[in-house]
Amino acid sequence: MFFACGHNGQRTTSEDGIHWSSPVFGKEGEVYRTAAAGPGEIVCIGRFGGQNITAASKDGATWKLGGNDAKYKDYIQGVTYGNGTFLALGGDPGSVGVGDPFVMLSSDGESWSSIVKTSGKFILRRAVWGNGMWVGVGDRGRRAASRDGKVWEDAPKVKAIDTLVDIAFGNDIFVGVGLHGLRMTSRDGITWENRQTGIEGEHLNSILWADHRFVAVGLGGTWTSSDGVTWDRKENQNAPLTAAYARGSFIGAHWRGRLLHSTDAIQWKEVFKSEQHFEAVAAV
């Protein structure tokens, strides 16, 4: 199943990434900003005023809504799934100098733990499970690893210029991507190598492990690699701001309210349009 969520509580699903259901809406002002999927469960997370809001569904039709008091500072920034667990990452996006990072965990996407404050100065925004660990990337170049999602070890001596905006795992390696075509690899989330950059201004917004290769999608170019070291770049058309992959299909979202589909992550076609913008897409 493919799904997308966004502004005014908007949620929609698709079996093939091409034909989408009529959106379900929430309250005006609700914004779902991140999404993840596990076996038999899809989850959207966002904010409404001073609240974190969650929406979980097994079929895309019936949703269980929830949330917690963010106190206008403990906002969830990202969510991912791995090892039978949904992991939500957050912190204070308005802080100066320290992000006050935290995590929340759930086995089903519906019932969540209380906020668990974690070490580190800056927020982790994206994470992936692989090799028996979580590896997360976040603000000001932060990169960290955790066995349980609660206790994190940071990579040393990181630089803000090397901020990674997304991360994927495949072929026994973690690969992160970022601004100006930045790509880096790691075996353990602590030691990073093979730093490469691309074209100035061509930011890589998403990286996916798709059909035995890494696929990094940016506005202008799509990069592919089997090992995270040797890459091939092709100019893309109509590329999305965020992307997901499953069963031979790539989906993505772009301003405003556009859902896109592709079979190669290079040629993208608009397949759905809404008056409300989609912030996140995911697939299972």
Q: Over which residues does each language-model region extend?
A:
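Residue-level hotspots at or immediately adjacent to binding/recognition sites across diverse folds
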Residues: 1-284
